[in-house]
């Protein structure tokens, strides 16, 4: 068998052993050194009072103390560590050179990597050519101290002499290899099976033969060698190579191996796919159509015809066995060749890296060619872009052209939705099955599989890919996806609800119900009705199957056969319905009461329950078929790539099932008693209620008698929604309990019994941070621990988190021994015992400070089980990957000390000083010392008296400038320090880079501490020691920032980037480089480039890239972030990747745990295991793909909004992730997770990138890992810092992004595969942790709306009928009193329970955060934080956020438009205008809230219960939350200045264009439905306009037409009933509410149409003439038209009130009906009759000015006037509604505005700042103050006049209602029934009528 049956694999390892946290040597208590040489080796424990010794030690540790001396006390540093501030070095900014003392006064003096270093005998400069990760010396330099080196180092120094790396490749890029071996583990002494030189020759050969790019080859060679070095550092070299080959190619978990068999490549290699026919069970050999010809004439004459041999296909298990045998026999060179070829194919694949199986196919063809004789004969290809241009580019262009067209060198998006785009997944899935590969044909029609294997690779350039690819899944925007994907959720809830509700609805079944007897249904009828739940379940499964038919094309080989399932489901449906039909339809009442019919009903119920359980438990794709055999080829690709779920361990499985059994056990119990059983009485009274004597014109009593049934129907639906909400409620509670229990189990709660975390910290540092087995036992543990602890404390000090006094109390001191023999001993800080002893009153750090938090978490985390670390030199290499686009790199001085805009009241520096007061004090203190030192060194004071010196200095250095801006002398070195301080406390890239470069510091620290012999070896040679530490750190850790825009950075951005590169020269920066277009071309040539701090500068002062790899085109085809990550993937190094965002932080103490974190991947136990050995079980387990980690949101406690955002991240990222990871429900959410790099990059990368569909790119990597067999774990003992949005708008932007992204996920194929294939418990975990959250939000808001509809319909009855007396304890069989009454009190009680349910669902969102705080920080902190949230109106924000989540998902499924929203990184201190907030949030929430508020007002006026107060708060929150959380919203002057801006916003934009105007907002809102006009072919999209396509009618139908339509009858029936005068025996008093409401609803529309046409005619006739003298003619005309509609709004309200006989409740209901009718009418017009919007507002301007001729309309001039008339008709009505709504919102805020000092209290609520630390008011000039006072006077008067007018419209009619009604009665109104009589309750006096059958 050929090697082609090999593929990529991934191996796993056995469980890592955990360290007993309390294991520690008794010698920790020893206070003396007993080892010779310790004192010189670790001289860190000097006395703090010995200044001379301190100086020596500072020099020893290469530590700069300039600016740090205070009272002759300095801090000893055990190990030199890189500071977060730049090193002591000279560097250039703004063309000036700054000395290191300017800013690095207190930081380590590690030499800049590219500057000279002193090594023993003098200055040795780094080589001009060097290796990227810091091999800085030439061999001659190293030879100077070879005598003091180890054997390995001596071998390196003679590297050229051995010839091992004596490479002649014609490039200076390899000169760094001559300096020193950058891969120390891959050396001859380690018995390597193949030398690095030979490996390079293989890479060069493949590059020449296949036409790979030279730089790409160099990059991939280094990539491969780093992998080999990483693996071989912890296992023998041969197994290191084999394990890599197993991970990539041939192992059991290798993706290539799985693809190889799923696509039947083994059959292609043996018999050829061209000889097979395809079926769902795999390829079959074709039957020969004719006999084979004789072989030759010679054979015929000799009679030696050979017998025909039958060709057969080996079974799958046989093929796999052959594969494994082949893998075992591969020699090392072949393994290297295969790995090299794959990596070279992958490295240049560009966007095709998102298609892993496509890459497998390309690699297979390339390998077939490599294995052939033609390969050996082939000549090198001169074009080094041959592979890119002929293989990758055609595929790239197909992908690009699906979404974009290229116009003038720019990509312009096509108007296609996902269902019409053949995306990455569709392309990739073509290669899953042999049927797909068989579709690949060349341009001449030849099938690729018919060609010889070795010719196929070179034929790829001739393939017609358009004929090959097709949609394999339709991601259409439809709610039908939810039916299919989550069918089991619907089955569980709908069926159970049916059982519960029908069982408690006996009156629905009983024919002859009598109230005095009560419900007595026939048992057989009752049970068979309940049993119809099985039919409900079957019907849901039928719908799911039908919709699957729609979404999955039948021609896709991976589609499941649905006809068989459909027919069996129909049979199930018949079996579940037939007994009911038999009992009800074919049985008399006497027969129904027989035992036989009851038996049928019971059997029916049993079968129904069986159906329900079966459909609930079994995934949709597994229905009605047996499990596949392991040897079966049936749907092998689906099993490998979509359903290869890792099995849970037995304990985790028990936890998973236990959690869901508890959830549903509690849910079913509570739902039955609280929801269903309590619903029994309302069902009974409403289902039997018969209204009497109710009539209206046209309909008589035909409608009103059905009012109770209609109300009951709405209540059924509402109860069903609440039934769904209960499940999520119990999920939150039970999940929280399980998470807390696990936190106790892991020991991470402060309530755990072993609370002495600080006392045991030294022991745990020794046992869990240090790799103690590798440490020489002669070294005392205390010595080692002191170095770690002192380094942590010093890092806190350098970051200005601790004052020098705190440091003195916290670190280990070296003191004289008590024995008096002159020896030294270490004094342990009292901190470790003081935390457990209340008698200590010493302050070790500021209370509730960042230092306290970090040290507490570090101590707490060490109490948890942590994998045992391995030696530093054996740890795997890993990379931190940071995507960067436009985030701030380093704050400029202007950004820090000046307000960002005119709306901001505070500078960033002032705000940061208030947030970090103690840290600012430490910073100022250090700055002053630095300034004093500079002053002393710059002036001659020898002739002055000492006292005069001190006095002069004191006068000179006044404290005020330092405390204000951080410096007094505005020289660059001082301003830079302030910039750095602010940047390290903001969300900047500098903070991220400096934080995560702590990994380098941690590795050097651990390596030195654990290897004291290294320090002894280089004793007195600190430069050499530092070099050795740098070499180890750069070998094990890389950090790569993917700066997509680097080549187009501004000068400031370039300067800031250079600053970071000089501070951290090992930092890698990948970016998108560009060459101008060649002659005759319009498209620039793009490259992926890499630089670091060692890259040379060209003549333009730009860094020369180390690698520059040509791309097929613009790689940014998606939403940006995922493409940016993919761009940098070839430049990562090592075995693992940590994905980080550019607003995160990390800390030294957390970085010390890196070895334990990497050990969680269970890949450290591979030392002697051959991955291809039969006995190796490590590679048979599912590999760990993703390792999740905690996040600390450092924006918490700085205001309510930042704290809410932080709390959500904490609960989701920690509390729930803890449980979800254990039960297999956790996915990947981006930061700060660690990824198994080989596993993920061979399966599509670290994210997905189709534009729009994958807007939440990170989570798809998690779903891919879950589907393909990877395990996802969670780490409790490690956390990173994370920034979060702080403003209302930015938080809601993030919410919108997540919501729209979830809408995209719901239509994706990943959700389809997971929803229809996951096992039951795993499915529930996935659903409720991800889509369930958003669906629950939709259900919450739906329940509120349904509740309001119930309230409106109940209020319509409650207002005009007599309600019966009701005693909750007595039965409903008691006669109702008074006579003729309506028994509505059970319905009111049901309302109360509904409100309680909805309240609990909202309140439950606070439980996880409270519990999280309670377990990790204690009861007081939990209560304090919760109290702050409630005092700051956090519940109102939660309501608004819930609505935003729900609206985002709904809008995305209706209109699409999901895009990456860059969330805010700054501090929200600026006041936003009312108009801006209204236009942003009106559509998502304010309009809905106002309609809900009107419903609630009617309900309150008719059915008052105290429970409604909660709904008043909630609905008000939906309307006014944006303004409540707007900084300084209630500042008196700003309020009226803003009101002026609001009036202007309403009025402008009608005579000339204005971006910020009401008409612009209205047009933008409308384009969501209509879209913009299609651009002409070849014409680019207009600037400033987002190209929005028209939404599809079917997508919009549900939300834009169906729901508004349903609200019309649901409100009208209540209105008709309230005006039907129930109980009135006089038929002559019947009114006509139908005609009345139609007139009132359409009168404003007609008036608006007439006004629009009239004014448009006036504009056409007079506009061009008057415009010569009256420039604002159009604006005046528009203002008159809008004013008329506002007046009409008032008329409609007052007339409606008059016609309702001045009954305010009925008037409110009539306004509800008018709004519902108009809303539906306008929706119909917009959806059906409005064409697309023009991309300019020319038609609007032409309408009011009459200038149609100059608008550039072209042929549109014929159709636009009629279209604009429709628009104006809707706009005028919308304007009137917005005018009144906005003023009502402003009037609601007025009482708050009048509260004294409200701005101060409001700021305290938002920012949690004490009154003494409030943000100062802005400073205005005298002219500005005068202007603002005039504005307040003018517009304040206008505001209050309008308020008086509004109040008058309400108060006057109320006062004079009786007189008005008596004096203004009109007979014509009575004649047509338009006038409603005064309210009279005709049922209250008792009649002979009754509402029930007694």
Swiss-Prot record:
Residues 1-53, 282-310 are annotated as: Disordered. It is a multi-pass membrane protein. Its EC number is 2.4.1.34. The chain crosses the membrane at residues 530-550, 566-586, 600-620, 655-675, 710-730, 731-751, 1338-1358, 1394-1414, 1476-1498, 1503-1525, 1598-1618, 1637-1657, 1673-1693, 1697-1717, 1778-1798, 1837-1857. Residues 286-296 have a biased composition (Basic residues). Belongs to the glycosyltransferase 48 family. This is 1,3-beta-glucan synthase component bgs2. It comes from Schizosaccharomyces pombe (strain 972 / ATCC 24843) (Fission yeast).
